[in-house]
Amino acid sequence: MATNYHDITIAFAGVCQAVSLVQQFAHKGSADREIFANSIKSLLVTQPDSTLAVFDGQLANLKLGLETVQAQMGSPNGKLDTEIGRYWINVLALSQKLNKNPEAKAKLAERLQQIERQLPLYENDIMADQMIANLAAIYSDVISPLGSKIHVLGLQDYLVRPDIQQKIRASLLAGIRAGILWQQVGGTRWQFLFSRRKILNQTQQFYKSI
């Protein structure tokens, strides 16, 4: 069966967009609201018709992620931006642990269904502060116990703020969702060693089409 780099790249861009948001919140205390929303909304797309449907069918919704993939896969001598690189590697590792843990997967699905039921209370706005706090709690309760915690670097003034902590955890949860998608469409870590150029080429094609 041929490797589907089209879908693998979309899913990986979703991971990279989420961890780029983590970095921005940690270092700047803010991130583009629309980009953040594109990642957060993906958490409620549980039965997509296609891989891109997870991101509302628009490659433009993954612009930051595609930029990040290009920087990661296209850097000289394959050298990664160590901070972003560490984040996506850890997110993929956690998503793989989640995939092997039926109990945690069931708990995650149940908690996300609760989020959907709560949405009408907040005018169906997944970006409402309480919704972000609830998503952050899911990350803490379901994902964090699966393995080593992801150590987020940034400015202490931002990292101590509860609202920033919640946005970081919600972004990481979106990254985990994209990591699960990445596995479902055939993503493996070996591809980063042996098929780096294919991922980069596909990313560049996507980016040019935006």
UniProtKB/Swiss-Prot annotation:
<keyword id="KW-0997">Cell inner membrane</keyword>
<dbReference type="GO" id="GO:0005886">
    <property type="term" value="C:plasma membrane"/>
</dbReference>
<feature type="coiled-coil region">
    <location>
        <begin position="103"/>
        <end position="130"/>
    </location>
</feature>
<keyword id="KW-1003">Cell membrane</keyword>
<dbReference type="Pfam" id="PF04356">
    <property type="entry name" value="DUF489"/>
</dbReference>
<keyword id="KW-0175">Coiled coil</keyword>
<protein>
    <recommendedName>
        <fullName>High frequency lysogenization protein HflD homolog</fullName>
    </recommendedName>
</protein>
<dbReference type="GO" id="GO:0005737">
    <property type="term" value="C:cytoplasm"/>
</dbReference>
<dbReference type="InterPro" id="IPR035932">
    <property type="entry name" value="HflD-like_sf"/>
</dbReference>
<keyword id="KW-0963">Cytoplasm</keyword>
<dbReference type="InterPro" id="IPR007451">
    <property type="entry name" value="HflD"/>
</dbReference>
<comment type="similarity">
    <text>Belongs to the HflD family.</text>
</comment>
<keyword id="KW-0472">Membrane</keyword>
